[in-house]
Every structure is written in C-alpha cells, then in structure tokens.
Amino acid sequence: MRRRESRGAKGGGFLTPPPSWHTTRRVYIAMPISERKRSPLIENQESFRVRTGDSPYVRAKHAQLVSKDPNRAISLFWAAINAGDRVDSALKDMVVVLKQLNRFDEGIEAIKSFRYLCPFESQDSIDNLLLELYMKSGRITEVAELLEHKLRTLEQDKHYGGRIKIAKRSHEEQNNKTIEQEKARILGNLAWVHLQLHNYGIAEQYYRNALSLEPDNNKLCNLAICLIRMERTHEAKSLLEDVKQSLGNQWKNEPFCKSFERATEMLAEREQATVADKPEDLLTSSFSDNFSSRCSGGMKGKKALAGTSTELGNIHKTNSHASSESVEQNSPGLTTQPRECKWVDEEVDQSKWDATIGASRKLRFWTVGPVRSLRFGNDYQKNLKSVGTAASTTNDELHQFISSDADCMTSKARKLCPELIKDKEDNEKESERIASESSSAYAKITDIGQRKVLHIDQRKVRHIGQRSV
C-alpha cells in the first residue's frame, strides 16, 4: 500500500481508492406481511386491544370483546356507570351493545338518564348515538328536533375558535373540520329528515343553504329528488345533468351513485307519468300539421259555398266517406258552438243550411233582426195573456226560442227540430188547460160571491120588514 511521499502534503492519507462496498448502497425489499415470520407472542395476541386491570369498565369490555356475551356486558357497563368508572365511555359502549341487540328504546332512555354525568367534550358523540337510535326506532320528529338543537348550539357557541376537532375512536386519529363544514353537514342531515317527513319546501331551503356553504354532489342529487317531489322536473333534470357533466363516466365510482341513480329513476318515472296523462304533448307537431291541413280544407269549403248549390252537393258527396271531424271542419262554422242562422231568400244561405243539415239538429237558432209575428202565433199569444205567472216563464222562453224569423221557416226546418215543436205543442196544451182551470175557478168564485150577496140582501129585507111591522 503506497503512502504519500510528503506526509505534510494537503489531504494526507492513502492514495488507494475506497472499497466498493462503501460506495454501493444496498437495497432492502420489504416482504409482504403475510410472508414475514411472526413471533409466538404476536401470533397469540388478539387483533383487538383490551384494557388491562380489574375495574368494572375493564371487566365489561372483556365481556363484550373477549367473552362475546352482550347481556353480561350490559350489566357490567351499568355497574361501571353506577361506580363512576369512565362514565362517558361506559355509557357509549353500552348504547352500542343495546343497538346491536335492537333494544333502541332502552338505549335512548339510558342516554337521557346519564348523559349529564358525561363531560362536555363527549356530548357531540352522544348526540350522534342518539340520532342513530332515533332513526332506527323510526322517531323522525325527534331526529329533526335534535338536529335543530345542534344547529342552534353550533351557531351560538364560540368555544371552538373557528375550528372543530372530531376524533375517530376506531382509528385513533383526528380530522379537522371548520364550523362551516360541520354546519353544512348538519343542514344536509336536517334537509334529509324533512324530505322523509314530506316537508319538501323546508327540505329545499336546507339543501340550498348547505350547498352555499360547501358544494356536495350527494346533496345536489337529494335536492333533485326534492324538486321532483314538488313537480319541478325541469330544475331537477338540469341539476342531474350538471352533476353528470362534471364527473363524466366516473360518477359510478362515487359514494353518491345510489342517490344519483335513485333521482334518475324518479325523473324517468315522473316523465312517463306526465306523458301518460297528457299524450297530446308528444303529438304537437303532427296536430299542428293536421290542423293546418284542416284549416285549408275549411277555406276550400267556404270558397265552394260561395258558388252554386250544385257545387255544395259535390262537396257533401266528397265528404260522405270522411269522419265527423273532417265534415265539421269543412262546415261553415263549428257545430259545437251556437250560431246565428239568418233566414233570407238568398239561395246561398239556404244552401249553407242544406250543407250542415246533418250536424245541427239540436242547436238553437236565433237572429238579431226585428221581431216578427208567427203564422201560428196569434192564438198562442192570446193564450199567453190568459195564463198565470206559473206558465208564463216557460212560454216566454219558448217564444224567444222560436224567434221572429219563424215566418220563413220551411218544412225542412220543421223536420229538423221535432222535439222543439213537440215541446211547443205540449206547452200550448198546458197553457190551455191552466187557462180553462183558472176560468172555471173564477166562475165558481164569482158564483159563490153572488150567492152570498143575495143571501145578505134577503136577510136585510126581512129585518127591515119586521121592524116596520
């Protein structure tokens, strides 16, 4: 091994290079946990941690986790609470065991009875347990009241200084949440509760307040469900489309996928229901086309009516194979509406009546012109004057119904309204009967009156004769 010739030279020492094992670094590959050798102590150790000692709480935890005896664990937890040994932990663990046994009412009563013994820091976790018990037992109203109480205390309490620390017992770690995040969580839960209570307006307000504090796709999907319940499908559809566009095809892997699928199913069902209730909405375009074609057909019919009567006959023949709707559309006016029928001597207006002869059988016809006297109306008017007030109303209505243009009514028009003529004849007979009855009654009354007058006169004459004698 060579040494430097001059020991006093700078950087004295050996001139040989350092060995290779100093420069190369060894790389250790970590073995999987399943392939590692385990010591006998680790193999015999349980997967959970059990506290050591002989206190009531430790014995209760041992019965819960090791012995797997929930009933004995509940009795030991009661003993720990009465002894004052870790009251908050014993109470919460006992409520968890009661919840596993579906004894929800007992857990609720235990929390209400002993939560005052627990410190302030554990009240929030106790409230969460109480909410779970209320939900399991179906007491939704109590859930809403408790959430509103938590919301009020969160807004009023300034103890946290802007941040809230919530410890997870299972992992023994802490998650920091701001007051706004915790408030948004409570508002979302409160909105869901009101959604179950069918208070959709209140639920919408809580959801929108929660989304203003913290955006959340799960709350957006629940808000869409709330809007669907309120028959506001367009807003719900836009919300769901925004959620789907923001995530693309990755929404199936998100935790809110069930809410999104539920909202989509409800929206599809509601749209199908609206289509079933109003099928004409889907046929708007075809209906408009048919309407325009029918309107053009109606204009053609009007032009044909302006011609001769032979053209009208041809139109009526061409429409003989069509449905009643097409015939009505080609008619001069809609037969479902009352209209004026001016009876004049022109052939065109008379031909209009001939064209619509089959569709206007029971319509009332009247005119605005001057009132004319009926050919058969002289006796009828005399009878009307002699009839009392009981029959005058119906006869006046009939007289207005058969208007002043009845002089020009042809035999063809009389055939069209046989029911009206029959009613008129019945009314005439009734008026004659009433008139005859009233006249006979008047005659009887006058006869009786005359007899009474004669009888009184005879008595007066007799009395005067007796006095004179």
From Swiss-Prot:
GO terms for biological process: cell division. InterPro entries: MS5/SDI1 (IPR044961), TPR-like_helical_dom_sf (IPR011990), TPR_2 (IPR013105), TPR_rpt (IPR019734). Keywords: Cell cycle, Cell division, Coiled coil, Nucleus, Repeat, TPR repeat. Residues 139-191 form a coiled coil. Expressed in floral and vegetative organs. Also barely detectable in leaves and stems. Its main location: nucleus. Belongs to the MS5 protein family. Residues 314-338 have a biased composition (Polar residues). PROSITE patterns: TPR (PS50005), TPR_REGION (PS50293). It comes from the Eukaryota. It is found in: Nucleus. This is Protein POLLENLESS 3-LIKE 1. Probably involved in the regulation of cell division. TPR repeats lie at residues 88-121, 124-157, 184-217. Residues 1-20, 314-339 are annotated as: Disordered. GO terms for cellular component: nucleus.
